[in-house]
Regions:
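Short loop/turn segments immediately following the C-termini of beta-strands
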Residues: 27, 37, 82, 122, ...
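Structural signal for beta-propeller blades
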Residues: 30-32, 85-86, 125-127
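Short loop/turn segments immediately following beta-strands, especially the blade-tip
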Residues: 34-43, 129-137
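Beta-propeller fold detector
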Residues: 1-4, 43-51, 96-100, 137-140
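Beta-rich, blade/repeat-based domains predominating
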Residues: 1-21, 52-82, 101-115, 122
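Short, solvent-exposed loop/turn segments at conserved positions within beta-propeller repeat blades
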Residues: 27-30, 42, 79
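Short coil turn/linker residues within repeat-based beta-strand modules
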Residues: 29, 39, 91-93, 132
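Blade-level signature of beta-propeller repeat domains, shared across WD40, Kelch, NHL, RCC1
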Residues: 106-140
Length: 140
């Protein structure tokens, strides 16, 4: 059953802590998308949840490089994008970007207290010590 279409280049998916919101990265767009998840599993209320920082426009359109997604225990959303790991509040406001030497592609919280953010991309892996804790009730 298809639940959404018209997403130019979907890449990266995550659920909110309460599993009522579906987040979808759009690599070829300017925005992280959000959908409300209904009781029957369908999704409604597609919206631009957060604007990626540093998205660029070229002859093929817009690209953000947005790929993997993770959440922390406070519901903040972490996006692996061309500029680094972008961090957004649960309301979609950009808090900042964790810079890396190469563009990241995926990420996950792990370790004691889930206070380590592992990030991979472009032939490299990174370990970032965090103050924030990853969401403990989910593997990623």
């Amino acid at each position: 059953m298809k639940v959404a279409d018209g997403i130019e280049r979907p890449n990266g998916i995550q659920l909110s802590r309460d599993e009522k919101t579906l987040f979808v990265n759009n690599t070829s767009g300017e925005y992280l998308l959000a959908f409300d998840i209904q009781a029957d599993g369908s999704v409604t209320n597609r919206r631009n949840f957060a604007k990626y920082e540093g998205a660029t426009r070229n002859e093929n359109g817009v690209t953000s490089g947005a790929d993997g997604l993770a959440l922390d225990s406070q519901g903040r959303v972490y996006v692996a994008a061309s500029t680094g790991v972008q961090v957004f509040t649960p309301q979609g406001q950009h808090l900042g970007t964790i810079p890396l030497s190469r563009p990241p592609q995926n990420l996950a919280f792990a370790g004691a207290g889930k206070k380590t953010l592992y990030v991979v991309g472009r032939g490299a892996a990174y370990k970032v010590a965090m103050i924030a804790e990853g969401f403990k009730d989910r593997v990623k």
